[in-house]
Curated annotation (Swiss-Prot):
Ca(2+) binds at D199, Y200, Q206. This is Complement C1q subcomponent subunit B. Disulfide bonds join C181-C198. One of its GO terms (cellular component) is complement component C1 complex. Transmembrane segments: none annotated. The keyword Translocase does not apply. Residues 117-253 form the C1q domain. SUPFAM superfamilies: TNF-like. The modification 5-hydroxylysine is found at K59, K62, K77, K92, K98, K110. It comes from Homo sapiens (Human). Core component of the complement C1 complex, a calcium-dependent complex composed of 1 molecule of the C1Q subcomplex, 2 molecules of C1R and 2 molecules of C1S. The C1Q subcomplex is composed 18 subunits: 3 chains of C1QA, C1QB, and C1QC trimerize to form 6 collagen-like triple helices connected to six globular ligand-recognition modules (C1q domain). Core component of the complement C1 complex, a multiprotein complex that initiates the classical pathway of the complement system, a cascade of proteins that leads to phagocytosis and breakdown of pathogens and signaling that strengthens the adaptive immune system. Residues 70-79 have a biased composition (Basic and acidic residues). The modification 4-hydroxyproline is found at P35, P38, P41, P53, P56, P65, P83, P86, P101, P104, P107.
Amino acid sequence: MMMKIPWGSIPVLMLLLLLGLIDISQAQLSCTGPPAIPGIPGIPGTPGPDGQPGTPGIKGEKGLPGLAGDHGEFGEKGDPGIPGNPGKVGPKGPMGPKGGPGAPGAPGPKGESGDYKATQKIAFSATRTINVPLRRDQTIRFDHVITNMNNNYEPRSGKFTCKVPGLYYFTYHASSRGNLCVNLMRGRERAQKVVTFCDYAYNTFQVTTGGMVLKLEQGENVFLQATDKNSLLGMEGANSIFSGFLLFPDMEA
């Protein structure tokens, strides 16, 4: 059976309870003596489990370089690499020794047919060894042949006969003692005078020369003809010579 406490007595009861607690604490203090000597440390306990990893620390400063290590052994040969780009052209080297003859090349294509006239070589030179007086209009015969390619000059007649039409050059050098005039003649059966060369001297040795380019047709003759001034000489030390040669053949003939 609960006991009813009047509301007016509650403060008194609280005061009495507080005073009782104070007395109890003072009684406990009065029973406490001086501190004792610390005892011997106990045996270390069993290590506890590892703790959780801590947070990463701040990056430290760079350390000093280490000592150089020993050279390692050579590894196996690797695969060839990709070819690099071509380098720059180097300087020109010295000329090498002369090589041997190469193999003969293949024959070239057949050429076009040529004109036989383009390959003709026609030339003559003849001297006069006959030292006898000449008559007017007489053909001057140069009887000693020096050169006569293709035999277009006839020493027995003293005439050149054209066999290949074209341009020819004729010249003469005549030694004489006194006045000398000669005619350069051309034609077939009836020759015509082309030009007359003259040189005048009285009782003295001289050399007369002359030359001309003529366009000849096949069968025409060319020769020198004497005039009334015909002191021509033909002897050792005073030679007279008649020459001629083909310059260009007539390709249209």
